[in-house]
Amino acid sequence: MSISRRKTLALLGGGFVVAAGGAGAGFLSTRTPTSALEAWSAAGRYDDPRMNALSYAILAPNPHNRQPWIADLSRPDTVTLYVDTNRLLPHTDPFSRQIVIGLGCFLEVLSLAAGQQGFRVDIDLFPDGSDDSALDDKPVAVIGFEPSEQAAEPKLFAQIPDRRSLKEPFDTSRQVSQSAIDALLATVTRGSHAATTNEADSVAKLRDLTAKALEIEFETPRTYKESVDLFRIGKSEVEANPDGIDFSGPMWEALHLTGLFSRKAAMDRDGFTYRSGLDMVRDTARTGMAYVWLISDTNSRYDQIVAGRDWVRVNLVATELGLGVQPMSQALQEYPEMSDLYADVHQMLASQGQTV
């Protein structure tokens, strides 16, 4: 038996949506993609501990919500994880570094969910080898389940259903306290190096760098189109394909119905939709109040998995603390147009030979 993404075995899911009511809702108030949200309510309802763990793991963050995982359950007490090579991001993520980080997030959430059930997972990464330049059909991980009373991390586990990546400007009236920063650093235990800043000058530099990186991704036609092709606009599209970049809820439904928001409009570089979208992402980047980043000694597949495991732990602790978190990793992307900012961010945040 194998399961793939959030749309199989009743593990249906996509982006998290809250539909707004109020005057004029009518048709639009019915536009919540209910079946695409079932993954959250179905989590933890299985007799097989592997299925239970997987029902939480599919809620893990992953780039562009591609959900590139395939889980094979044919061996007893074992999950074999593969990557779906049809769900990669060849333009923004040409070496699939971000995809592998997302698989690391998946493995960490699976581990937390298994621990909550009284199981320890033994994870054998890339048992048949790996290629740092491309992904293939070899196993990403073989995961064995063993009973254990020592594996649970209940505080982190409790945050899994509520964890989100913030997609709106940060509250610039709220400072991020040093105690919160210390808590984020303390949860990085899987092997990455972690650093943070809430110091004004450093924050200003990172705001500027992330805004420039978003602008490059937006204004490079092939990388921008890669995102636009993954837009899921309105309830019917989210229900049909509960992956990608979610634009559902009354506002987006209304804009779509009136023709003000569509893939065609988004691709018109001289149009309102394109220009306002660029302004929105750039302005959001310039509201960050503190930054946390993870550093690896190499850029190997192993280190990418570890970074993903540590990243989702940071995201879960931030959720517990009531902090909004958004990955601003565009400057870390490895396509030619981003090379100058890639060099800048590594000079700013990493030592020689390390990878942010």
What positions do the PLM features span?
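Acidic, surface-exposed loops and disordered segments
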Residues: 2-356
